[in-house]
Amino acid sequence: MAAIVIVGAQWGDEGKGKATDILGGLVDYVVKPNGGNNAGHTVVVGGEKYELKLLPAGVLSETATPILGNGVVINLEALFEEIDGLEARGADASRLRISANAHLVAPYHQVMDRVQERFLGKRAIGTTGRGIGPTYADKVSRVGIRVQDIFDESILRQKVESALDYKNQVLVKMYNRKAIVAEEIVQYFLSYADRLRPMVIDATLVLNEALDQGKHVLMEGGQATMLDVDHGTYPFVTSSNPTAGGASVGSGIGPTKITSSLGIIKAYTTRVGAGPFPTELFDKWGEYLQTVGGEVGVNTGRKRRCGWYDSVIARYASRVNGFTDYFLTKLDVLTGIGEIPICVAYDVDGVRHDEMPLTQSEFHHATPIFETMPAWDEDITDCKTFEDLPQKAQDYVRRLEELSGARFSYIGVGPGRDQTIVLHDVLADN
C-alpha cells in the first residue's frame, strides 16, 4: 500500500503533470484533491503534448483510475470540453470518476470573479477569471452547489435561487450589472446530469478501500505551496489548500495513510500573476529562462515571471508539507548559462533571514542573498543516470539538495516522460 501526495513547492508550473504522468502509470488511482480549471499542466506522452486544466494528468494513464476529489471545484462545461478534446485525439477518459461531494462552478461564479477583479483595479489579485475563488467562497459560506445536487431538481432549484437572492443584489446595486435568471442556471446544470451521473462515486470510500486492499494511490495537488490560502503569499494566493494537508482533506484519505510527500520544484523559479517574488529577474536572464524554459501559462497564456532558485522557499515548502522527497524539473534549461546564482537567504533591512520572514511586509522587502555555481555546457537531455550528468550539473543538484530540506529523488532533464533520472523510487520505498 502506498498513498503518495504530489505538491508544487513554489508558485505553480513546476512540472507536477510530468511527475504524475510518470508515477500515474505505476499506481491504481490518481486523485486530484483541490483546485479547478484555473491551473493547467502540460504532459508529453509518446511525443504528443497534452495541455490539461481540470483533469488530473493521471487521466492519460492506461491503467490508473483518475478521480476528481471532494476538494475540487468543477466547471461542467470545461470538464466535458476537456474530455471530448482528449477522446478526439484517441485518449480514453472513460475511467474518470468524480466525488459526489465536489462543488460546482456556476456561471454566476465566473461573473462575480470578473467584476470583482475589475472593481479592485490596481489591487486586483490576478485571478484567471474562471470563478474558482467565488465557488470556494460559497462552499465555505455553506451556499455552494455540489455534484450530488444536480440529480435532485428541487434541491438544485432551491440552492440556485437562494444563492442568487444575494448575488443579484450585489451585481445590480454594486456593480451595475444585469440580474442573473435562476431558471437559466438550473437548466444549465440539468443539461449535464445524465452524462455526469455514471461518473459519480463515493470517492472517500473507494480510495480508502483501495488502500486497505494494498493498492497504490497518487494524490495530484494543483497549484503550489506558495499559493496556499493559509501558507502562501497571502493575499496573492489561490482559494484552496494545495499543500499535503489539503490533499488529505480534498481526497478523504486520512493523513496517517500518506506514505510519501513528493515536492515538485524547478531548477529555477517562476510565478504567474501579482505578488512578491524575491529572486525575480528583469534582465536578459529572465528573458532567457522565459524563452528556453517555455514559460508561458498553459491556462492563461500569460508569460511567467522568472527568477533564480530560492532555497528559502524550498525549505519552507519542505517544512509545511513534510516532504520526504523532491522531484527537480527543468535542469536542462540551465545548460550553458555560465554561472547560476542560488538564493540561500534573504536580507531584510540589513538583517539576514535563513527562513521565511515572519510578516508579509518583510517578505515584500526581502532581497536575495546569492551564492553562485558554475553551469555546464554539455547537453544533458539524454542522460539516464545521475552519473551521466556533467560533474558541474551533479554539483548543482547536490547543493540544492543540501539547501532544500529533503532528498532529491527524481531529476527532469527534458519534457519527455523518459527524460527523467530516478535516484530513489518512492513507490519501491513503500
From Swiss-Prot:
The entry's keywords: Cytoplasm, GTP-binding, Ligase, Magnesium, Metal-binding, Nucleotide-binding, Purine biosynthesis
Pathway: Purine metabolism; AMP biosynthesis via de novo pathway; AMP from IMP: step 1/2
First and last residue of the signal peptide: none
Gene Ontology biological process terms, A to Z: 'de novo' AMP biosynthetic process; IMP metabolic process
GO molecular function list: adenylosuccinate synthase activity; GTP binding; magnesium ion binding
InterPro entries noted in UniProt: Adenylosuccin_syn_GTP-bd (IPR018220), Adenylosuccin_syn_Lys_AS (IPR033128), Adenylosuccinate_synth_dom1 (IPR042109), Adenylosuccinate_synth_dom2 (IPR042110), Adenylosuccinate_synth_dom3 (IPR042111), Adenylosuccinate_synthetase (IPR001114), P-loop_NTPase (IPR027417)
Enzyme Commission (EC) number: 6.3.4.4
Oligomer status and interactors: Homodimer.
Protein name listed in UniProt: Adenylosuccinate synthetase
Organism, scientific name: Corynebacterium glutamicum (strain ATCC 13032 / DSM 20300 / JCM 1318 / BCRC 11384 / CCUG 27702 / LMG 3730 / NBRC 12168 / NCIMB 10025 / NRRL B-2784 / 534)
Lineage: Bacteria, Bacillati, Actinomycetota, Actinomycetes, Mycobacteriales
